[in-house]
Amino acid sequence: MRDISWLTSRPIAHRGYHDKSRGCLENSQSAVQAAVDKGFAIEVDLQQSADDVPIVFHDDTLDRLTFESGPVRQRSAAELTGIALRGTDDRLWTLDDLLDQVDGKAGLCIEIKSRFGRTPERAFIASIAASLARYSGPVAVKSFDPEMLALMREAAPDIPRGALGDGARDLKEWGRASRV
């Protein structure tokens, strides 16, 4: 497993260094660049597109941060990357786009979003693992879904993984934590 000391050695900009009042939204190119410029590590979220491409976006639906609506998972990466974020010059982007922009200059803590109760998509996890394999900077992944982390362990055992929880419901879910 890789060195994880970077996770506690400097601040981590949650969803990038964003500030809505200056037109810099969470998980955007601008927020990520601002975090890099400040010397912070960066936490971002990944949603699955209809064609299994990791999209840098927090919400399950497009409604809150774009002028579009509906689930992210029902659109292709080509469709999603054409969607502008409200009030900005930024658009939705892929994990590969993010990795190209950051270019190893910052640690990345990546949250893999989940469809709890449904079979996790191996192709989606494989795509994430393949992209992260080429990243030259430090990286770790996390998820609320133990199945996603178990699949990441299979696909990329050297990438550090972290389990997230938000209540008693998770105690039952994380009973299988040895697979993570």
Please state what every model-predicted region is.
Residues 1-180:
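Phosphate-group recognition and catalysis centered on beta-loop-alpha active-site segments
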